[in-house]
Amino acid sequence: MITAEKHPLDNCQLFVQLKKIFHDNNEQAKCLKDMIYWSGNDEHIEKICDQVTDLLEEHDLIIQPPDTMDPFAMNQLRGLLVYLVLNTAHDYFLCKSQWSANVMHLCNQLPPIPLFLTIAIAVNCCLMEPLEEFLACGPRWLTIQYFEAFNEALSVINSDCVETLPLLSAALRAAGRAIVNCNLPAENKQLLRQIACMEHRHILDSKQRLHTLPRPSTRKIYLAKAMDHLIEVLLYTLNDPLKREKPNCFAVYSQITEDISDSNSSDPMPDLRHFAQILLDVLRRIFQLVSVDTYMYWHEMKSKSALYNCQELICRQTAELLKVLQSDNMLGEHPVCKQMQSFADAAKTLEQRVAEMRMGELLVFLDSGMATDEELLAGLDNLFSRFIAFGNDECVETMANHLIMLTKKHAQIILSFLGQVVESEMVVEDEGISVTEVNQGDDEDETSSNDDYEELLSLVLRPLFMQLNVEDKMEVLLLRDEQNVTQGFNFKAPDHRERRIRFFNQLDYNKRFPITKFLVLCFENARQTWIDFSHLGVTHTRFSKLFWHIAQSCPKHAAFHISACADNILVNEQLLQKPYALQFTLYLYGHRQILNGLYTSARQLCVSLKDGRCPYGEDELRQAQNRFLDACAYGLAKFIEPMNLPSLQLILKLLKQISLGESNLITRGTAELNALEKEHPKLENGDDAPAVKVAKHYTYLNASLPEWRLKHWKLISHVMKTIDALRWDLATFEDFRVDNLELAVWYWQDGLSHLTFLGTECRQRILNQVNSLKHKGFWLIYLKEDTLKDTRSFLKLLTQSSAQEANDLFKKLLKKRADCAVMGDLSDAVVKVNSESAFMAFRFLFREYLIAFRSHAKHNKTITKRQHWDHLMAVVAKAPFSIRNEIMKLASKAFAVRFGINIQEQQAAKC
């Protein structure tokens, strides 16, 4: 099979064989230069045309002439036509120097061919399309001769007036495009005269000429065909003529000769209007010939459209043409417009016509292969509007057969329908089990299957999604999320899991992100795809940046799935120990602000206080926060039972960072709002400027985050349980455990310690929770004003406290002057347990005592430094004997210089 030639004007085997045909006919049959007229040379012309056709068939350039042509061979056929034109005897012949150097090698290879023979070959040997292109794009001095010759030869080529109409239409289309492609006012006048002559000669536009057709039915058919062709030419010519670029084939035909024409005019519309008026005059005369009987006869006639009968098609074409004419002030005044109005009023749009069809008729029409692209699209739109089609195998098969015509709109229609199915099924419970309950089983199997629509998903929606561009894919995924479709339908391919794992294993942050493959994975299982992506985000800062870059490119879709990432990471021990886990999960908490948009100020990223790519309101922000805090609570619950201290520590650090981050967010937001208020003063009516209103909205939402967080009961209760589980005694003390306890207590004290100011209901809820805890002491302190009455109470609390709690207790003991007694009791308890953990606990508590003692000594000015030192030494003397020297060193290092004590002199005095 011959493919499209990049250089159609190169010498080739086809030209060599064609050259032989013409030379043989010139020498053996009849000399071509003696063929002056068509008449009398019919047999010779037919013979040459047959030989050329056979040659084109031999090269597979045409198949079953003249019905089908190999589209890949069009450039070769263009070259063949130019080859014939260059060797045609024209009315005046340019000398060789006037031919373009690009085609000089093809000249004089054949005996001079009569011009009418070239036209005959073009018409009879499937070169009509290249001929039309040549007439529209070729040099005007040359093409005008072909218009004249075509006018003379048309009735000879085919004496049937109806069958000549398509050939006439081709010439008229070419003339209209020639005016635009090469606008030469002087030559245009000659061309317009030729067109007027051609129409007058070949169109039967009067009653007398029409009656030359022998039968009334033939006359009615002729009028329909003539109107059809004329209206099509006018629509082709007048529909945005200046916006259409020159065709690619223009270069092939325009390079035949050097440019010897006058300069082009910049505005072809005057001549184009003149051209249209010539055709409209003819159309007006034809309208006058249409009787009621003829109009009704058209109703029974088939048209070239599978959708319309002849009458309906003409009415529709007339309505389209009238709209185009009325958009032009001059053409809209043509008398034919009034004649066209009644036809236009009876026109049915494509949408109206397909809506009238029964389902079976619509499917036959779509599958007939006879519909135009415009008709197919209208039919498919109507099919998609009939929701019953989505569950019908034949309808789905028809949709699948026309995937190339389907767009994002059709995917959205399917998803909207599936969303309605899911919504209806969520309401109806089957044997007491709802769809929601069924789908909560397996994280990996995000969706369930609905067999009624399995083929719709596999044969239509999935391949349709694959052919969409990236932006459309994102919009389709977002609509599916909004409609909650994945709750009822399975979109996964059998090999989805393997491809997803391979995708992330091969992902390289230094290379271009394969967004199309990623979106396909999201189509199949968006939740798990985003979760797997987040697993990379906790491993390295570059993967984290990549994650958020992709999330910000499809923010509304990502917003539906980022909470699931937090749900997964915060209960995964391995992921929580990754190097970037803390920072990445903190970003997950603020994902609504990140997705809406960030900006850089003073080299720092700041949260935008305006509607960005993913605006949010109070409901969206609270929902995202609640989901994240739920995940934190689940993480605490999971890791506290096996006392997984590293995982607990990260979650507790995360809660601390959240608290600090919210404070920073509020501070920066307030500063930005103040700047905006200065930049945008109030309006005349006293209202805030629109930008300030939006900024106040987001500032209020951000400022509400701490309050909402501190009212999240699930997290409150699990923080309380975590603190209770982390409480230690002398037998279980370890530094890492106390570090975690410190974080948990910090979070509690940061916002929840002032429970005396809470409402009765909240206090009672916490009291009920306290009653279920093992260590109630500190909670009673938080809930009641005075619960510490004796040293035993202090000692009990000290041996389960965090660093800050111990510090606070020691301050109270120093104030009551009971510190020495409590430290003595503590020392006795440590000696009694006599374990490494007990001695470590004493060291820990003594360090906190020193911190409290420093504050006490600083503010108590009534006692001398020596007295403070002596008191401290009395406490040191209470330390267990085995670690007393170590405790002494800690005390001396902290206070000897401060109190002016010479340790060496003191030790010498003791000796």
Swiss-Prot record:
Tell me where on the tree of life, at the top rank, the source sits: Eukaryota
Question: Under the cellular component aspect of Gene Ontology, which terms does the record hold?
Answer: SMN complex
Q: What happens when the gene is disrupted?
A: RNAi-mediated knockdown targeting all 3 Gem4 paralogs (Glos/Gem4a, Gem4b and Gem4c) is larval lethal.
Q: What does this protein do?
A: Component of the survival motor neuron (SMN) complex that catalyzes the assembly of small nuclear ribonucleoproteins (snRNPs), the building blocks of the spliceosome, and thereby plays an important role in the splicing of cellular pre-mRNAs. One of 3 almost identical paralogs (Glos/Gem4a, Gem4b and Gem4c), resulting from a genomic triplication, that have some redundant function. Required for neuromuscular function and organismal viability.
Question: Could you describe the subunit structure of this protein?
Answer: Component of the core survival motor neuron (SMN) complex composed of Smn, Gem2, Gem3, rig/Gem5 and one of 3 almost identical Gem4 paralogs encoded by Glos/Gem4a, Gem4b or Gem4c.
Identification of the protein by name: Gem-associated protein 4c
Q: Which organism is it from?
A: Drosophila melanogaster (Fruit fly)
